Amino acid sequence: MSEMTPREIVSELNRHIIGQDKAKRAVAIALRNRWRRMQLEESLRVEVTPKNILMIGPTGVGKTEIARRLAKLANVPFIKVEATKFTEVGYVGKEVESIIRDLTDVAVKLTHQQAMEKVKFRAEELAEERVLDALLPPPRDAWGQAEQKEENSSTRQVFRKKLREGQLNDKEIEINVAVPQMGVEIMAPPGMEEMTNQLQGLFQNLAGDTKKKRKMKIKDALKALVEEEAAKLVNQEELKEQAIYNVENNGIVFIDEIDKICKRGEVSGPDVSREGVQRDLLPLIEGSTVSTKHGMVRTDHILFIASGAFQVAKPSDLIPELQGRLPIRVELEALSSNDFKRILTEPKASLTEQYVALMKTEQVDVQFTEDGIKQIADAAWQVNETTENIGARRLHTVLERLMDEISFDATEKAGQAFVIDAAYVKARLGELVEDEDLSRFIL
């Protein structure tokens, strides 16, 4: 689990996301509270439940990006789902419990990676010995049995040195390696994914592990053998227990587009993909036990972060019980022209930086001037104001249109330099931005 302070978390998010300080503070506090809870005594820890968050803001202002970056920072089981993908239990479509099953799969994978990392050094030693055995097979006795090998013979040490220095990387050897089982793919009817997962696991277990002699280069053999030896050193049952503990105490679920499951007006008949989904989400958020292929998972201490644009619906259109389960409300502001300018230059791997790097691969030098960047930001903001406001995503459209000519002709213009200044931007985008009908279809 990440031990970063709220200030450090916000600072890290600032490297990728412009503005939205309230939302950053809220998720930073929530993430730190996960760590604080784990420092408490067991009797008190059980009583401390997470304060779930509802992020409200127009499209393209950074809600999903905050979740994406948070997942990388947290180093805990994290899953992002779209609320619109689910339907009420009993109807065709995904059930909300599959969120916890998927989160548990993520946790098992994460725990497995961490466990493999811990035993990597020992696995590398064992893999090295197996490669040396293949290079220097031990002599056999009269009965055809391999004699005890000399671990520290001078020849073996010479080969070990060469192996570690990479001098033998391209030499081919024949080794016994575990053969990956043929995957049994079963098409799942909607709502029956769990049953098909169990069937697939059953078929794979029936097949068992088989080994096969293969000829491969030493560098590839080492990689395969390290994985094989590491897998032997790891206790799979312990891994599952750790993963379930990790999900129950550190898991985070990000539910996007929650506004799309609000009830709109008076609807007669069952509203299976809206209010029904909200009612199914309630027990998950409040705390229930979900059956997964790895074991039973309690959701009492999983943190839920929901987000939505709420352009048509309002947060008050959510059913009251669900509103009560999302006590922390954070509003994200719409982006201004100045925000667009900062988005183009300040974040790590900004859009302008990406285009410059892409063109460099063709030996074309592209430079964005300050007035050119301001003109691009103004153009994107103006189109958002006059047509549909899609936030920072508009910058992708505008930049792609602006760079169209350079990108297409780059192969013939190797060695040339292009300066994207205000005049260049006006010449390419001026007419489109001013003509509302054109910008609706092209930008």
Swiss-Prot record:
Annotated CDD domains: RecA-like_HslU (cd19498)
Entry keyword annotation includes Cytoplasm: yes
SUPFAM superfamilies, sorted: P-loop containing nucleoside triphosphate hydrolases
Primary localisation category: cytoplasm
Any Gene Ontology biological process: protein unfolding
CC annotations in GO: HslUV protease complex
Subcellular location: Cytoplasm
A Pfam family this chain is assigned to: AAA_2
Keywords, in A-Z order: ATP-binding, Chaperone, Cytoplasm, Nucleotide-binding
Record GO terms (molecular function): ATP binding; ATP hydrolysis activity; peptidase activity; proteasome-activating activity
Positions bound to ATP: 18, 60-65, 256, 321, 393
PANTHER family noted in UniProt: ATP-DEPENDENT CLP PROTEASE ATP-BINDING SUBUNIT CLPX-LIKE, MITOCHONDRIAL-RELATED, ATP-DEPENDENT PROTEASE ATPASE SUBUNIT HSLU
Function in brief: ATPase subunit of a proteasome-like degradation complex; this subunit has chaperone activity. The binding of ATP and its subsequent hydrolysis by HslU are essential for unfolding of protein substrates subsequently hydrolyzed by HslV. HslU recognizes the N-terminal part of its protein substrates and unfolds these before they are guided to HslV for hydrolysis.
Family: Belongs to the ClpX chaperone family. HslU subfamily.
Assembly behavior: A double ring-shaped homohexamer of HslV is capped on each side by a ring-shaped HslU homohexamer. The assembly of the HslU/HslV complex is dependent on binding of ATP.
Annotated protein name in UniProt: ATP-dependent protease ATPase subunit HslU
Organism expressing this protein natively: Vibrio cholerae serotype O1 (strain ATCC 39315 / El Tor Inaba N16961)
Lineage: Bacteria, Pseudomonadati, Pseudomonadota, Gammaproteobacteria, Vibrionales
